[in-house]
Swiss-Prot record:
Origin species: Varicella-zoster virus (strain Dumas) (HHV-3)
UniProt cross-references to InterPro entries, sorted A to Z: HSV_PRIM (IPR033685)
Pfam families, per database record: Herpes_UL52
Entry similarity comment: Belongs to the herpesviridae DNA primase family.
Enzyme class: transferase
Function: Essential component of the helicase/primase complex. Unwinds the DNA at the replication forks and generates single-stranded DNA for both leading and lagging strand synthesis. The primase initiates primer synthesis and thereby produces large amount of short RNA primers on the lagging strand that the polymerase elongates using dNTPs.
Name of the protein in its database record: DNA primase
Keyword entries, A-Z: DNA replication, Host nucleus, Metal-binding, Transferase, Zinc, Zinc-finger
Example of a GO biological process term: DNA replication
Length: 1083
């Protein structure tokens, strides 16, 4: 019978002395005087009849903590000896150690291979395994299988023979250092055994000992090492030792077999809650100071044998499988969603963290641990599908996320439209009073300019004079005499606390400022004044015949019989100046007629009608050809800016968004941040998918409108690339800063005004209009079917678009927040278009490309056909038509011409049809946008917010009155002592500065109190860095608050003036928990 197929026991042992020295004595045929102690062991299934007994009987019988072996051993010993003696049993002895090869690292390594056959040998083995009795070395010597044992050591012996030159010198190479290949082959074939090892040990004892000690590197482990590594409980000491060292004696760093460290194994065994009897040895963990006690304790444990031990392996394997299955489920969801979930980078990071948090938050983990806890002693553990961790996460999170991957489901499940229906008469009046007058409609012939255009300061004075004239007749003045500013913070004047420090402390503690404001109160700026004037339709019914004009708007325009609403424009002038314009009628044809297709291009456009619109590639190339024909025909465009506002009005013009009016055209400010230049054919193909996604979303959002994604127009305008050396002035930064009510936000972030058109970057990259018509001819459209072979766009980092989509009749939008939400929905709709992602996705740096910051009252957006202004006064980057012809377009030339109609690219244009507005979309609800941010905030509220108030925490410590005097007394008497002790330990020598310190309360909030420490000596020094020279002492603060673990904490922070410490910025040094000493301050 093959010895490898016999019943086998794998046994980990230790000795009181050096285990390597005693083992080498046995291997070389000598008898050691030091016995062996069994630490842990395991067996093969064919020995279950010996080691696995009726567990219920073991549990129910009463066994004293210390039992005399002579009384209880006889019957059990006879039964075990009978089972043992009926077969031969292999016993393999192990020591901690082994080889490390690639990804595989052994934890234990065999040293003896024995075969037990006689009753005497089995009796000694029984006492060692059942009661931890020392195993006599004579037993090992008598049962040692020489051949199998030295098969284990053959490689070590061969290596030692080579390294100690225990070969014929003729086998060496000429240099005497390397063994020849022939000699190595001969050595490998040569069998080695006890004789070779004995010879090596006799002649090279130090080298042999060193080699074996390197191999069995755990030979010197003490009992304390086992307790520390595998303890501290009996269950983990016995079960984790056996599983970690004998049942998984090798660590595999592969994906197929997940690598669990020892702490993880110990944690897994905590949920294996099978009842166990007290240890028969009578020892506690603290008593195990020698190997004889450790062996007796481990071998006498209930966890060593029986059903408890047998089921432990099955349980831990199933537990690992269950845990890894749940974890991999999250990874699979994330991997699959990564391909289809196209969201901005910030949102995707939030998604990754949220996905893990939804599966592994405290409640989910607690439920999972409860589900996998096993306490059944008899039945085999079955943990398959016991945990619903992944299912809950799928239901609560992933299903909601995946609804964003289908446009119809996304809008149905995430978007709630609040729509108000108007009657025909009300709708007609509402349309007239809330949209621009018909004078804005494009006219083929030049018309007379009626309006006003001047510098901001001039217009401000003009408006003030007009309001003074009309205020006696019912006009409500918009300019207060004393604009409000900051409320004085009297509590802080004598504390020396800077406003920056207070803001930093407020921000750190998530509390509002003292006055409860969200920003500075400022007077209305010129932008708000002009928007108010332009949207007003009249004044009170007083007799104003004594005035030159009937309405303030007529007085502002300087022309009678004009009615509003009217568009308000901002005009960027050279050197950072700006002007504003309110226009009732304009010569739009003089602006747009220069951007017409030439006669020969019209003939080509007629030929392009023959292209099959269903052919996506051909249609994209057709659109590219039309765009290039226009760009090459543009001539006599001024590139020099003017300081005269009325002249500059025709070079740069930006429409101001007016929340007082309704939105009839959706204007999207699109900026694609790209990795590399995009071929023009690819760009046109991507924008065709962009158009289809927008119109598909509108079809779903406006169910009572007739929307045809294959026919309805969508107008694209692309910016032109400036000269490489031109520094572009971000003219959207020139907006009137006083038009912002939340100006403190911009001041705190180092900006006076956030860029509107370029909200996040200052670079502007435009489409190249210098490509000659000879590069792409009509032959390209019919012959070139590869969009990737078209010439690349010259934009290197960013491509800017203006996309104008008419709101379908009879709908209109109202409100800044509504339009922002609408733009976010459309961005998601575009990302759900497969063609868009396939064509343009590989070129994009991120998937956030629609800027919603422009949809705020008083913000402006540059109109098509106008340029930006550089710092040198040069006009660059015109917004030129970028044609995307609908599939079912009947008249291509008419579609091209409609790009020049200003009624198609103004926010508040009057609908060109005679159908009045009937449905007003005034709010968008649901989780259509910022889903991840809302989920993060909700989870933070649930899991990270304190459950007890600061008042309650202080009352538990005897502070019943939350006034400044009581709080200061509490800090001085209770908290400062803990602070000084902490500083003495972690900042030696600095505690002297805090010995005579007192506190001064400077801010009391609902969940946060701020104190400033007053030094009684020379002053405090910086605790962050040692600064040179005599610097002003930093301010030191302590804040009292309750953390998310419901602990009352005190934080010490400093405000140092040194540059190294961020120049007076508040920095928290450390945080301590306030001990719970009730009634400390009651006296």
């Amino acid at each position: 019978m093959d010895k490898s197929s016999k019943p086998t026991i794998r046994l980990l042992f230790a000795t009181k002395g050096c285990a390597i020295s005693h083992s080498l004595l046995l291997l070389t045929g000598q008898i050691s005087t030091e016995p062996l102690y069994v630490v842990s062991y395991t067996w093969t299934p064919d020995l279950d009849d010996v080691f696995v007994k009726n567990g219920r009987e073991e549990i129910t019988q009463v066994i004293p903590t210390k039992r005399p072996r002579e009384v209880t051993e006889n019957d059990e010993e006879n039964q075990i000896m009978h089972l043992f003696c009926s077969r031969d049993v292999n016993v393999i002895f192990y020591l901690i150690g082994g080889f490390s090869t690639g990804d595989v690292r052994s934890r234990v390594w065999p040293i003896f291979f024995c075969c037990f056959k006689t009753q005497t040998d089995f009796k000694a083995l029984y006492k060692a395994l059942w009661y931890g009795a020392p195993l006599n070395p004579h037993i090992i010597s008598d049962t040692l299988c020489i051949s199998e044992t030295f098969d284990i050591h053959s490689e070590v012996i061969q290596t030692l023979m080579v390294t100690t030159h225990h070969l014929n010198r003729k086998g060496l190479s000429d240099n005497g250092l390397c063994i020849t290949e022939a000699t190595l082959c001969k050595l490998v074939k040569k069998s080695v055994g006890r004789q070779e090892l004995t010879s090596l040990y006799a002649h090279y004892e130090r080298q042999v000992l060193a080699a074996y000690r390197r191999l069995y590197w755990g030979y010197g482990c003490s009992p304390f090492w086992y307790i520390v590594r595998f303890g501290p409980s009996e269950k983990t000491l016995v079960l984790a030792t056996r599983y970690y060292l004998l049942q998984t004696d090798t660590s595999y760093n592969t994906l197929e077999t997940p690598l669990y460290d020892l702490q993880a194994i110990k944690d897994l065994f905590l949920t294996y809650q099978v009842p166990a009897l007290p240890n028969c040895s009578g020892y506690n963990i603290s008593d195990l100071l020698s190997f004889d006690k450790l062996s007796m304790f481990c071998c006498s444990s209930t966890y060593t044998r029986g059903l408890t031990a047998k089921n432990a392996l099955s349980y831990i394997l199933q537990r690992i499988h269950t845990d890894t299955t749940e974890i991999h489920a999250v990874s699979e969801y994330i991997t699959n969603d990564r391909k289809g979930l196209k969201v901005p980078d910030r949102e995707f990071v939030d998604y990754i963290y949220l996905a893990h948090f939804e599966c592994f938050n405290r409640k989910q983990i607690a439920d999972h641990l409860q589900a996998v806890t096993y306490s059944d002693f008899v039945n085999k553990p079955v943990l398959l599908k016991s945990s619903n961790l992944g299912k809950r996460a799928t239901a609560n999170f992933f299903n909601h996320v995946r609804s964003r991957l289908n446009m119809r489901d996304y809008i149905k499940k995430n978007v709630i439209c609040d729509v108000t229906e108007l009657g025909p008469e009300i709708g007609h009046k509402y349309t007239i009073t809330k949209t621009y007058t018909l004078s804005l409609t494009y006219a083929a012939k030049p018309s007379k300019f009626i309006g006003v255009c001047d510098l901001a300061t001039t217009l401000t004075r003009r408006v003030e004079n007009i309001e003074k004239q009309f205020s006696p007749y019912g006009w409500s003045s918009t300019i207060p005499s004393n604009p409000p500013g900051f409320d004085e913070l009297s509590n802080f004047e004598d504390s020396g606390v800077s406003a920056e420090a207070l803001r930093a402390a407020n921000f750190a503690n998530d509390t509002p400022n003292q006055s409860g404001r969200t920003g500075f109160d400022t007077s209305p700026g010129i932008t708000k004044l002009l928007l108010f004037f332009s949207a007003a339709t009249g004044i009170a019914t007083h007799d104003v015949s004594i005035l030159s004009y009937k309405t303030p708007l007529e007085a502002l325009i300087g022309h009678s019989e004009v009615t509003g609403p009217m568009p308000v424009y901002r005009v960027a002038l050279p050197h950072g100046a700006q002007a504003f314009a309110v226009i009732a009628n304009d010569t739009w044809s003089s602006i747009t007629n220069r951007y017409t297709l030439p006669h020969e291009a019209r003939l080509i456009a007629e030929d392009l009608k023959q292209i099959n619109p269903c052919n996506f590639v051909a249609a994209s190339l057709r659109d590219m050809q039309l765009t290039l024909l226009l760009s090459t025909s543009v001539k006599n465009v001024s590139k020099i800016s003017s300081n005269i506002p009325k002249d500059q009005l025709y070079i740069n013009r930006n429409e101001l968004f007016n929340t007082n009016l309704i939105i009839t055209n959706l204007i999207l400010d699109v900026d694609f941040h790209i990795r590399k230049p995009i071929p023009l054919g690819i760009l046109h193909a991507g924008m065709r998918a962009f158009r289809h996604g927008i119109l598909t979303a509108m079809q779903l959002l406006f169910p009572k409108a007739v929307v045809n994604p294959n026919k309805d127009p969508c107008y694209f305008y692309k910016t032109a690339c400036p000269e490489p050396t031109v520094e572009v002035l971000d003219d959207d930064n020139l907006l009137d800063i006083t038009s912002h009510s939340d100006i403190d936000f911009y001041i705190e972030n180092g900006e006076l005004y956030t860029c509107v058109e370029e909200n996040y970057t200052e670079d502007v990259w435009f489409f190249d209009t210098q490509t000659t018509s000879e590069v792409h001819t009509h032959a390209d459209v019919s012959n070139n079917e590869n969009l990737h072979e078209t010439l690349p766009c010259n934009c290197k980092e960013k491509i800017g678009f203006r996309v104008c989509v008419p709101i379908p009749n009879p709908y209109a939008l109202v409100g800044s927040s509504t339009l922002k939400g609408f733009a976010q929905i459309l961005q998601q709709a575009v990302l759900l278009e497969r063609e868009f992602v396939e064509y343009i996705g590989p070129y994009l740096r991120d998937f956030s490309f629609i800027d919603t910051g422009v949809y705020s009252h008083g913000h402006s957006l540059r109109l098509p056909f106008f340029s930006k202004v550089t710092t040198t006064g040069t006009a660059v980057g015109q917004l030129l038509p970028f044609y995307v012809v609908p599939e079912q377009c009947i008249d291509i030339l008419a579609f091209v011409t409609s790009h020049r109609n200003p009624a198609n690219f103004h926010f508040h244009s009057r609908p060109q049809s005679n159908v009045p507005v009937q449905f007003i979309l005034h709010n968008l609800g649901g989780e259509y946008a910022e889903f991840f941010e809302r989920k993060v905030a909700r989870n933070k509220q649930i899991f990270s917010s304190p459950q007890i108030s600061l008042t309650k925490a202080l009352k538990e410590r005897g502070v019943t009155c939350l006034d400044a005097f009581t709080l200061e007394a509490f800090v001085d008497s209770t908290i400062l002592e803990s602070i000084v002790e902490h500083i003495a330990v972690h900042f030696p020598g600095r505690d002297r500065e805090y010995t005579l310190t007192s506190s001064k309360c400077i801010a009391i909030k609902r969940d946060w109190v701020l104190f400033q420490l007053i030094c009684g000596t020379k002053g405090f020094t910086c605790l962050r860095y040692p600064h040179r020279g005599g610097r002003t002492a930093p301010r030191t603060f302590v804040s009292l608050r309750v953390d998310h673990h419901n602990r009352l904490c005190i934080s010490l922070a400093q405000q140092c003036f040194a540059t190294k410490c961020d120049s007076n910025r508040m920095h928290t040094i450390f945080t301590l928990e306030v001990p719970n000493y009730p009634n400390l301050t009651s006296s």
